[in-house]
């Protein structure tokens, strides 16, 4: 069966363009021409807690969240939600420790605090690690929606990357931090409205005799609703232990030391506003991620009762199907369709037996259903192997295409345009927050550090911040143009963060709690800890014992940095210890 691509019509384009251009123009116009660096980088400290909370959420919730997480739920179930179990505690710690210090010192960036507490080289190291990892992540956040949208909508990938990148550069450079926060508020409104619409339509499109209750039971029987895994196996990426411990340190570093988030809440009108904004996220983040994963699990059930492609990246599939591998791929497609029909019948058999309250019959029907699912999935793996045989560089990770395929196939025109706007809005919101933070850090921690005489020239500072913001936007576009990712995109983002975040968090924990440790000790400790994490990551394929969940990198990097700092402080000559001053 050939699955044709549905294209957007005039109504979809009108909805998309009005939504996106309206949001960008609104933010740029209302925050144009900030004359002071404080206004450009912090929004003049007038932001209320609601805007802070939404801005913090929007900076984290990129298009990857709304493209990749439903695919994660579709493919692996809702267990990914464990990744966020440590987040509420992390935000409480940020509110109690990090935020008051940043507010008291009046810093523009988190790394200014490191310079005051330690020395300039430690400040530059912290800023450098942030710029490196966030610069890479910015490339992923622009690559993610571009590759999906270009594939589904027929746009050229390079032009899609450049177009979305330039749009976000324009309004971020024009208005600075205030523009980012203001536009993110409207973007999140579009996002929530669009996702709720998709959830409702998906529920209505389920078979009438099934309903939401039946769909949930099928998802559970298929292993898609296992939210908590107590396994002690270190090879498993997502367990309650990686979520509570690894996720705690990942979230603590991200919200406490990543300038893309710090900049969102230090611009609050008061300490209370920043705290309330963060608590808003502590309460809503897990339910939001759970809902998006559940949407993916329900998509899995939906496609059990609909004709489903053997490979969800349909443009990629059709490209190879029209080539020398066409006969093989068409045979696999027919085989998959036949097995998919068998699987559907086994599911209906299981549903019928469930009503009879016969445990033995239910168990047998369930086993038959799972065997049919395994057979269908085996053909999908055969298809991916065939694609790789045709081209070793073929992208076989197709879970990111499931939700966008559902949008294009199943939703009415107008709603399609709205949900495509959701994807782009999420991309722009996250990208704007990242670029704003990269420009701020480059200006404050690099340019003003090496050009101290320019620190008092407000016009020059704002101009430099704008140029750095635009420069990082161009770097991110360039990285996105030449990058390729084999991981699920939401995992790619978390892997990049986990490689760096633990060490950066370790530096800050030493600064906060180990008052006797000096700058030289923590500097070399951080270098050693980061080297250790690089070794663990790049040697994991050579040494299987090192191939454990990437979330543990956060805990290992942090513990190594703190431990090495204490050791070096004990053996190095005594160093002067600074006390930060407001």
Where are these regions (language model features)?
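Membrane-embedded helix-loop-helix hairpins and adjacent transmembrane boundary segments
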Residues: 1-582
